[in-house]
């Protein structure tokens, strides 16, 4: 895959770091790519992904949400849409990227990933060139959020290595805490060729103090045993509004915008916007890094 990544630099024109002009052009509009992951299923990761996407859109951002969970893809259920096409149609040259993007009633665009990302590594040069050019058309978005699979399966590490920021979602449950530490350990020991901008989000808390306490426990353990810095981005309350929105197949940011979970999501997105992220590298570099992830 590293050879593919090198070839991709030529295809997308990203192989000239000394070219100041190209650097300046990329900074004029650089898409921010956020991967949202978790150590285990059932912690509300997909709900967080969907509602964060909507919160960014409500700030006036152009947002694309990609379902990168290759095993249990269900973003479309929360958005109440039925995608007829996915990334595999682009890879097979049956559709363009523009043709598979779904507009939603919530102000965000959606791409069904299916198992498309898992097929990229096996593409021929010609196929990769076509897909790379199609994928680069997503560069007009301000934010791309990728809802990854849970745990380490299904290309999760590739998404994490390629994203500008990575949100690890956990809950106060002991198993979720243990699994959150586990996925952080794997991320920090397997991805060795670049820093990973990790942020911790504690979902389904009953108080702000509980969220802070859980985050401090994980952050302290990560620092002590892994020597890695991870930031606490915030918490989301346990609330009946979340389940009610799932039943209605509408995001809680839409169904109940003044609920506690909605307020929490707005605060998290606001805090993220004010933070100083690592330089966003855009969609072209995302694909190059996705193909060229190095591990121990």
Where in this protein do the model-derived segments appear?
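Walker A/P-loop NTP-binding active-site region of P-loop NTPases
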Residues: 33-97
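NTP-binding/hydrolysis catalytic cores, primarily Walker-type P-loop NTPases
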Residues: 250-296
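Extreme N-terminal, non-catalytic leader segments
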Residues: 1-39
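G-domain G4 guanine-recognition motif of GTPases
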Residues: 171-172, 198-212, 235-242, 257
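P-loop/Walker-type NTP enzyme "switch/lid" segment
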Residues: 68-142, 192, 247
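Conserved C-terminal guanine-recognition region of P-loop GTPase G domains, centered on the G4
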Residues: 133-135, 177-194
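Inter-motif core of Ras-like GTPase G domains
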Residues: 134-139, 153-175
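Beta-strand-loop-alpha "switch" segments that mediate conformational coupling across diverse proteins
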Residues: 224-253, 264-267
């Amino acid at each position: 895959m590293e050879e593919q990544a090198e070839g991709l630099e030529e295809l997308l024109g990203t192989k000239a770091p000394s070219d100041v002009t190209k650097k300046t052009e990329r900074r004029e509009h650089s898409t921010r790519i956020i991967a949202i992951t978790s150590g285990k299923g059932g912690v509300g990761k997909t709900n967080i992904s969907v509602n964060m996407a909507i919160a960014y859109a409500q700030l006036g951002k152009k947002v694309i949400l990609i379902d990168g969970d290759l095993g249990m893809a269900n973003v479309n259920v929360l958005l109440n849409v039925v995608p007829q096409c996915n990334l595999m149609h682009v890879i097979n040259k049956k559709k363009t990227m523009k043709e598979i993007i779904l507009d939603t009633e919530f102000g965000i665009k959606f791409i069904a990933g299916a198992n498309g990302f898992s097929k990229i590594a096996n593409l021929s040069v010609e196929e990769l060139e076509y897909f790379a050019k199609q994928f680069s058309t997503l560069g007009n978005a301000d934010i791309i959020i990728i809802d990854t699979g849970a745990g380490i399966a299904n290309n999760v590490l590739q998404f994490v290595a390629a994203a500008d920021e990575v949100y690890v979602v956990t809950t106060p449950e002991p198993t979720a805490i243990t699994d959150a530490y586990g996925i952080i350990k794997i991320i920090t020991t397997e991805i060795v060729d670049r820093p990973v901008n990790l942020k911790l989000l504690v979902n389904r808390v009953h108080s702000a103090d509980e969220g802070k306490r859980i985050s401090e426990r994980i952050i302290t353990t990560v620092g002590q045993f892994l020597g890695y810095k991870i930031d606490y981005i915030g918490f989301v309350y346990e609330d009946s509004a979340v389940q009610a929105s799932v039943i209605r197949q509408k995001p809680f940011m839409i169904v109940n915008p003044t609920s506690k979970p909605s307020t929490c999501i707005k605060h998290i997105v606001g805090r993220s916007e004010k933070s100083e992220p690592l330089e966003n590298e855009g969609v072209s570099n995302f694909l190059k890094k996705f193909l060229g992830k190095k591990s121990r």
